[in-house]
């Protein structure tokens, strides 16, 4: 018997993040000009440009859904793994990290038709979804390793490599560029930049992009676990306060029972149940209450105010709960109403028993239509009407 052949599953593509910058934009030129200053300068430069896209704190409400250019792209490599990125202009490798594990690169695509523009993605996130800051991270040291910055922002797509190619190298088109790439891999520095071979290529990048597919926005991705101290170096604290996630909401815990509240006023009101404090007194009878709402309900007894009225009959009530209970009676009346006597019932069981009582009161029923009568004479008189109708139809 032939043994079953086990076929190994192909490895899943690594999830990465991407930053696409128009080559003719100011950020693209600054990245090429300041590339020799190291990876930290590039991160700082990107975040400074991201800061210019954010609205002013005075013009933004914390609860408003704002579309920002900060977009989280968790599955970029799975959707773009088959695309080819020719001519990588800037290649960034962090020091002390293996190339196949931590590769941070910037690709300025030479082919405008291969550009994946912001309109094609159609992914928008509000400020609360863009940057989430864990409150436990606010106590981290400012001397945190710079590797968190490298993990925070990836400027390339680390997709699957073609067969037969070195995973540490990117595809090239000519021999001159292949020689430059091999020299770059041998250098110990963390940053190597190359320029396009001619000016025609640069002009084509700037002029041949279709108008409908022009990249208008800067896409930056930042991990949710970015430390607050690290992010505050580039972004204003007031803006960070606007972009905090719901998970950073402070909870106020009662020390006696452990119950939590999201507002301090709720905690203070709750603690009065433990202490027995009643700071609200009635001006008419002097009775004390621990909540202001309970005092308002009590004062309506003295004033006779009934602000809640029934929408069916117009009856007024002092409390909204009393009105709701009363309106339920009208609803049940419409459902369980006897067609014989017009009596209403709050429950279906009572309504069925009432209908059976009508049947017991009328033991004589017509064999033709099923109508019931309390007396036999009335039933026989009714049955004659059916026989009279038949004789008329026969004539």
UniProtKB/Swiss-Prot annotation:
Disulfide partners: none
SUPFAM superfamilies: beta-beta-alpha zinc fingers (SSF57667)
Tagged with keyword Nucleus: yes
Tissue-specific expression: Highly expressed in testis, weakly expressed in spleen, thymus, prostate, ovary, small intestine colon and peripheral blood leukocytes.
GO cellular component: nucleus
Region (Interaction with PRMT3): 246-395
GO function term, MF aspect, one: zinc ion binding
Keyword set includes Repeat: yes
Region (Disordered): 157-208
Source organism, top-level taxon: Eukaryota
Location, primary (coarse class): nucleus
Residue ranges with Basic and acidic residues bias: 169-181
Localization per Swiss-Prot or TrEMBL: Nucleus
Entry-linked SMART domains: ZnF_C2H2 (SM00355)
Segments forming C2H2-type zinc fingers: 252-274, 280-302, 308-330, 336-358, 364-386
Biological process per Gene Ontology, one example term: protein localization to nucleus
Keyword annotations of the record: Metal-binding, Nucleus, Repeat, Transcription, Transcription regulation, Zinc, Zinc-finger
Subunit structure: Interacts (via C-terminus) with PRMT3 (via zinc-finger); the interaction is direct and required to localize protein arginine N-methyltransferase PRMT3 to the nucleus and inhibit its proteasomal degradation.
Its job: Localizes protein arginine N-methyltransferase PRMT3 to the nucleus.
Protein name: Zinc finger protein 200
Organism: Homo sapiens
Annotated gene: ZNF200
């Amino acid at each position: 018997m032939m043994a079953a052949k086990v076929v190994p599953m192909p490895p899943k593509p690594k999830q990465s993040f991407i930053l696409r910058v128009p080559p003719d934009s100011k950020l693209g030129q600054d990245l090429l000009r300041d590339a020799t200053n190291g990876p930290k300068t590039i991160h700082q430069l990107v975040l400074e440009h991201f800061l210019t896209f954010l609205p002013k704190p005075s013009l933004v409400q914390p609860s408003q859904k704002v579309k920002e250019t900060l977009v989280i792209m968790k599955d970029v490599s799975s959707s773009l793994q088959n695309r080819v990125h020719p001519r990588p202009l800037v290649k960034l490798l962090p020091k002390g990290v293996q190339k196949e594990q931590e590769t941070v690169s910037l690709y300025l695509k030479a082919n405008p038709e291969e550009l994946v523009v912001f309109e094609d993605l159609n992914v928008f996130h509000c400020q609360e979804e863009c940057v989430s800051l864990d409150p436990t991270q606010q106590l981290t040291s400012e001397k945190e390793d710079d590797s968190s910055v490298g993990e925070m922002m990836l400027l390339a797509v680390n997709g699957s490599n073609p067969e037969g190619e070195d995973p540490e190298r990117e595809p090239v088109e000519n021999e001159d560029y292949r020689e430059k790439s091999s020299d770059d891999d041998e250098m110990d520095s963390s940053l190597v930049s190359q320029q396009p071979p001619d000016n025609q290529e640069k002009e084509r990048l700037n002029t041949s992009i279709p108008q409908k597919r022009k990249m208008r926005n800067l896409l930056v991705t930042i991990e949710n676990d970015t430390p607050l101290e690290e992010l505050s170096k580039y972004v204003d604290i007031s803006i960070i306060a606007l972009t905090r996630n719901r998970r950073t909401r402070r909870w106020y815990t009662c020390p006696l029972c452990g119950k939590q509240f999201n507002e301090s006023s709720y905690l203070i009101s709750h603690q009065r149940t433990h202490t027995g404090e009643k700071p609200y007194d009635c001006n008419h009878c002097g009775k004390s209450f621990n909540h202001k709402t309970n005092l308002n309900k009590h004062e309506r007894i003295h004033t006779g105010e009934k602000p809640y009225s029934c929408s069916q009959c117009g009856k007024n009530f002092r409390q909204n709960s009393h009105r709701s209970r009363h309106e339920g009676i009208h609803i049940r009346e419409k459902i369980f109403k006897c067609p014989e006597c017009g009596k209403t019932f709050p429950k279906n069981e009572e309504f069925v028993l009432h209908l059976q009582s009508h049947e017991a009161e009328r033991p004589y029923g017509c064999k033709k239509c099923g109508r019931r009568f309390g007396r036999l004479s009335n039933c026989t008189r009714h049955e004659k009407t059916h026989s009279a109708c038949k004789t008329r139809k026969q004539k």
